[in-house]
């Protein structure tokens, strides 16, 4: 072999070694770059998961707050409705003796006396107007004559045997009862058939 051929062979070997060294360095550099990219990807994925969990938690908090707000609003509306419905309860209770007295005046008035007749007509008109006015505000008369006894609406003063009435039926109403918006203000006082 000649010197020139040796030099060419040596140069080829050196180039191969340089390429081999370069390739190993490139591989190490590529591996470290890949490792750092994988670490960065893992870090970003962890941050994404944490952010998604935080978003879900905040959405849950917002939903709970909205539900609580709706519950508070609903309760407040119910309280206002109850206050409106039953604000008149005490006032209506005080009006019941007036209704009773107007009815007694009609029952006990002398209908044969001409002078008292006009007065009784006035009392009857007053009673009708008064009853229709209080009915507009939810006051309802309980007059259970001939109905089955209901302890929620009636107060039994006594029981009496009666062949004309079925057992456990109201045969005499001693005092009418009243409800205000479906709540018993005063039960009707009744005599019940045995």
Swiss-Prot record:
Keywords for this protein: Chaperone, Cytoplasm, Stress response
Alphabetized PANTHER family for the sequence: GRPE PROTEIN (PTHR21237), GRPE PROTEIN HOMOLOG, MITOCHONDRIAL (PTHR21237:SF23)
GO cellular component terms given for this protein: cytosol
Family statement drawn from the similarity comment of this UniProt entry: Belongs to the GrpE family.
Role of this protein: Participates actively in the response to hyperosmotic and heat shock by preventing the aggregation of stress-denatured proteins, in association with DnaK and GrpE. It is the nucleotide exchange factor for DnaK and may function as a thermosensor. Unfolded proteins bind initially to DnaJ; upon interaction with the DnaJ-bound protein, DnaK hydrolyzes its bound ATP, resulting in the formation of a stable complex. GrpE releases ADP from DnaK; ATP binding to DnaK triggers the release of the substrate protein, thus completing the reaction cycle.
Protein source organism: Aliivibrio fischeri (strain MJ11) (Vibrio fischeri)
GO biological process: protein folding
HAMAP family reported for this sequence: GrpE (MF_01151)
UniProt xrefs under NCBIfam families: PRK14139.1, PRK14140.1, PRK14150.1
GO molecular function: adenyl-nucleotide exchange factor activity; protein homodimerization activity; protein-folding chaperone binding; unfolded protein binding
Subunit structure: Homodimer.
Gene designation: grpE
Source superkingdom: Bacteria
Places the protein is found: Cytoplasm
InterPro entries attached to this UniProt entry: GrpE (IPR000740), GrpE_coiled_coil (IPR013805), GrpE_head (IPR009012)
Protein name: Protein GrpE
């Amino acid at each position: 072999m000649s010197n020139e051929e040796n030099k060419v062979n040596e140069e080829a070997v050196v180039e191969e070694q340089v390429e081999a060294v370069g390739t190993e360095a490139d591989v190490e550099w590529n591996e470290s770059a890949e490792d750092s990219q994988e670490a960065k990807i893992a870090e970003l994925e962890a941050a994404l998961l944490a952010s998604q969990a935080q978003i879900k938690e905040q959405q849950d908090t917002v939903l709970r707050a909205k539900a609580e707000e709706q519950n508070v609003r609903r309760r407040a509306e119910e309280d206002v409705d109850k206050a409106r419905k039953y604000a008149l309860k005490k006032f209506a209770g005080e009006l019941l003796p007036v209704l009773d007295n107007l009815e007694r005046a009609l029952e006990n008035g002398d209908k044969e006396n001409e002078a008292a007749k006009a007065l009784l007509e006035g009392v009857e008109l007053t009673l009708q107007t008064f009853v229709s006015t209080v009915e507009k505000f939810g006051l309802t008369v309980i007059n259970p004559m001939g109905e089955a006894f209901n302890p929620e609406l009636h107060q039994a003063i006594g029981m009496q045997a009666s062949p004309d009435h079925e057992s456990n039926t109201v045969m005499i109403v001693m005092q009418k009862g009243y409800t205000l918006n479906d709540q018993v203000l005063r039960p009707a006082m009744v005599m019940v058939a045995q």
